[in-house]
Amino acid sequence: MYNDQPIFAPSEWKLTKQQEVLCLETRQIASSKFVERAVKYDLEASFPTENYKDLHESNLMGICIPKKYGGRDADLKTYMLAASEIGRYCGATALTFNMHVSSCLWTGYLADNLDMDDEKRNEHNNLRAMHYERILKKGSIYAQPFSEGNASAAGKSAFGTTALRTDKGWIINGKKIFASLSGHANYYGVLCTELFSENSPPSRANTMYVAIPSLQEGVRVEGEWDPLGMRGTVSRTLIFENVFIPFDEQLMPRGIY
């Protein structure tokens, strides 16, 4: 284990006790385990799967999951401080972990500060409990592929990836580029446009945020990924072709995102 000093000295940066503890935990696990594997991931352009197993065993996969669901309850600042320590030793893990944690922050800290009526709030709480259980108990990894090569991610147009509503769920069709964790995440947290019929015009007002199981029929990964310094993120192209998902794979309430 490296005996490196913390990036953010607790007394100088006036860290809270929670921030100090999480920074210590991430520094210890990254300096003792991640650093020795980092070169291999970059050389092979392979995903840091072993590091995620260590994060799960160290109770860090739920770093930003609310405490009442069994998580560590870190806010954005606390997570950023802790993740900085991971980045010192394995950039690929820090970058991809950010995608996973962002899903937890959106459904957790962000959602808790949005206005919802009681019905939507109860629905969201019930659904996110299921997603959080997957993460905490199974170590499930949630990716966050948004990019499509158009203006949608900037909020200038509707997402080209669509979710056709059916009686039992949605049928997803579309493509995401630069999709980090492709082929390695358990669930893809996808932004898409809900359609109520095949002839419905796409609208930004109908943006959906849903989880697509990576092993679901119709999901595939294409293309190469070989950029300098980011090979381990495995940000290839995701294709969704008539992929069915049930309603409980919703990550954020409809009309809220």
Located regions from the model:
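Intrinsic disorder at enzyme termini
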Residues: 1-18
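N-terminal glycine-rich anion-binding loops that anchor highly charged ligand groups
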Residues: 22-29, 46-62
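N-terminal capping segment at the start of a domain
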Residues: 30-39
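Glycine-rich flavin
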Residues: 49, 56, 63-176, 180
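Structural beta-strand/beta-sheet cores of well-ordered domains, especially the beta-sheet scaffolds
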Residues: 140-142, 159, 186-188, 208, ...
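A short core secondary-structure module
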Residues: 175-221
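Flexible, small-/acidic-enriched active-site or ligand-binding loops
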Residues: 217-244
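A glycine-rich, basic-preceded beta-loop-alpha segment at the flavin cofactor/substrate interface
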Residues: 241-257
